[in-house]
Amino acid sequence: MGLGLWIRTGILMTLLTVVLVGIGYLLGGTGGMIIAFTLALFMNLISYWFSDSIVLNWYNARIVSEEEAPELHYIVEKLARQAGIPKPRVAIVPTMVPNAFATGRSPRNAVVAVTEGLLQLLNKDELEGVIAHEISHIKNRDTLIQTIAAVLAGAIMILVDFARWSLWFGAYDDERDSGSVIGLILAIILAPLAATLIQLAISRSREYLADETGARISGKPHALASALMKIEEAVRYRPLRRGNPATAHMFIINPFRGIDFAELFSTHPPTEKRIERLRKIALEMGIIF
């Protein structure tokens, strides 16, 4: 892992730790801050070593063998070879919402996950375009930061839920407790916003890069553009209802569109702009679509 990636990972962990500690202070003063800092250290350790397993478990994703999904394995192996990385493991997510993501702290520990809905929606060329995009995230070492961000942002959201429950069911009788109520309200409002802004900082530019790298790996920018349009339309019609919004930035298209902050603070560039960039890449490759 290069120095630049170590620095980016360290900055991400530090920022999310600060958010966690801030929530802890708002919830419980100095004691809450100490507990939150301890939790942050534990979550940083867990997120580095086990974040891929955590994310896969969130979506009940199942690692599949070549015998179970021969064509999918063939595509992943071919594109990984063209990208010059080890073949990732392959997982299928049991949902009809079409989407895909990659996870893992390094190319040797990586997993490419696709949903059942994606396999049904796309043709072979489009599927290659999507998988090439995910392979590019692995090649560009985005998956470590993306997955750590998902796990730590998930921890932040758990604390926010705790703050919400405390606000609803707590007993606040004197003026001193009014400060606690204000703290809880601030935590509920500001913490998700902070986590989202941090996700934005690591996501948008990397999506453009993965689109470009993936298009050049597969040689089919038009197929990726077509896949993005299909997935975008499907997600708008039927967004993912079960899952962790903290993982939104990991997917090729935000699957939670329409049910949270996603429209105001999108973790992805507009699909139209991504397709326009793919058109330019296609022209460079002598492809018109």
Swiss-Prot record:
Q: Which residues bind Zn(2+)?
A: H133, H137, E207
Instruction: Indicate where this protein resides in the cell.
Output: Cell membrane
Keyword list (alphabetical) reads: Cell membrane, Hydrolase, Membrane, Metal-binding, Metalloprotease, Protease, Transmembrane, Transmembrane helix, Zinc
Residues spanning the membrane: 15-35, 36-56, 143-163, 182-202
- Mind naming one GO cellular-component term on file for this protein? plasma membrane
Required co-factors: Zn(2+)
> Entry's InterPro entries?
HtpX_protease, Pept_M48_protease_HtpX, Peptidase_M48
Q: How is the cofactor bound?
A: Binds 1 zinc ion per subunit.
Tell me its EC number(s), please. Answer: 3.4.24.-
Claim: Repeat is one of the keywords in the record = no
Q: Which GO terms describe its biological process?
A: proteolysis
Matches recorded under CDD domains = M48B_HtpX_like (cd07336)
Record-level Gene Ontology MF annotations: metalloendopeptidase activity; zinc ion binding
Active site positions: E134
Tell me where on the tree of life, at the top rank, the source sits.
Archaea
Its main localization is membrane
- Report the membrane topology from the UniProt record: Multi-pass membrane protein
Family the UniProt entry places it in? Belongs to the peptidase M48B family.
UniProt xrefs under PANTHER family: PROTEASE HTPX, PROTEASE HTPX HOMOLOG
* UniProt name for this protein: Protease HtpX homolog
Q: Which gene encodes it?
A: htpX
